[in-house]
Each structure stands twice: as structure tokens, then as C-alpha cells.
A protein has these predicted regions:
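Conserved Rossmann-like nucleotide-binding pocket used by diverse enzymes
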Residues: 5, 22, 90
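Mobile active-site "lid"/loop adjacent to the S-adenosyl-L-methionine
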Residues: 26, 41-75, 95-100
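C-terminal catalytic and target-recognition region of SAM-dependent MTase-like enzymes
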Residues: 27-28, 32-39, 43, 85-156
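A short glycine-rich, Lys/Arg-flanked "PGG" loop and its adjoining helix->strand segment in the class I
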Residues: 73-85
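Single conserved hydrophobic/aromatic residue that forms the stacking wall/gate
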Residues: 1-11
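S-adenosyl-L-methionine
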Residues: 12-32
Length: 156
């Protein structure tokens, strides 16, 4: 395969994608090939799900969010190692916290000069300096949406 999906198991069912998902410790796994595209749905605080899970806002713990950030950066770093030149890494979290979104991408961009941000052209997205937030009001006909942060990185 030329693509790798790192995600929760439910994404396959939710999106009806026919892919082989293996449950592995991504940071410990050994990869023998490189990929043209990687979708990384990283673990996060889930703050973007507050519309459906209001209690998530009561459980905000800055130290946990900082731990998530560390893991998110490690996962992106590993993804970049197994990403082909001219390949794309799509980083997604269901959070709007700057530590898990903009700050993560800013740290990666500062460290890796061979990475550039790729534009997403969609009226359903809200542009920020290091990525995009999905506009939950764009899906009113479906009852709304959670808030997601998406950043597309291209390895050059």
C-alpha cells in the first residue's frame, strides 16, 4: 500500500472505507516501507466534541493536554520519517486547544525545513496560520459537526 492510516478503529466504520486497520503502538512499530500519504488521527483531549459531550470541558487538564501534545509531535515525527518525498501527511485532532493544534504544527514547521503547509480549498473550513478548523455550522443539514483541526503537510 502507498497510504497509511493511523486512527481510531471507528473511523473505518464511520467513513465506510475499505482498509486494513491494525491495532499497533504506532510509536514502537517498525515500518519497512515509506508511504505517499499518511492520515494521522492523533489522540487528543477531544475538546472539539463538547457539543455532544459537554462534560469534556469540565475535565480540561493542562498537564494532560501537554502530554497529548508531546505524543502528537512524536507521532508526526515518526510519520515524517516514513513519508516519501512529495508525500502528504494529514494531521487531524478533534480539539480546538492551541496546544494540540496550531502549536503542534508550528513546532514541527520550525524543526523541519523540508515540510510545507498545503492549502485546503473549502468553504466548510476556517483558516488559521497552521491549519484549518472544520466549521461545525457547515453541516447544519446533518445536525451539525464536532470541531476538528486539520493540517496537511507536504514533504518537499
Amino acid at each position: 500500500p502507498s497510504s497509511l492510516v493511523g486512527s481510531e478503529m471507528c473511523i473505518r466504520d464511520r467513513l465506510n472505507i475499505k482498509i486494513n486497520i491494525q491495532k499497533i503502538d504506532f510509536l514502537k512499530a517498525k515500518f519497512t516501507q515509506k508511504y505517499n500519504s499518511i492520515l494521522l488521527d492523533a489522540p487528543c483531549s477531544a475538546l472539539g466534541t463538547f457539543r455532544r459531550n459537554p462534560d469534556v470541558t469540565l475535565k480540561i487538564d493542562q498537564s494532560k493536554i501537554k502530554k497529548h501534545q508531546k505524543i502528537q509531535i512524536q507521532m508526526i515525527e515518526k510519520s515524517l520519517k516514513i513519508l516519501n518525498k512529495n508525500g502528504f501527511l494529514v494531521y487531524i485532532v478533534c480539539s480546538f486547544h492551541p496546544f494540540e493544534t496550531i502549536e503542534v504544527i508550528d513546532k514541527i514547521m520550525q524543526k523541519h525545513k523540508n515540510i510545507k503547509l498545503h492549502k485546503i480549498n473549502s468553504h466548510k473550513m476556517i483558516k488559521r496560520q497552521s491549519g484549518y478548523f472544520i466549521n461545525p455550522l457547515s453541516f447544519k443539514e446533518l445536525g451539525g459537526s464536532d470541531i476538528f483541526f486539520v493540517s496537511v503537510l507536504e514533504k518537499i
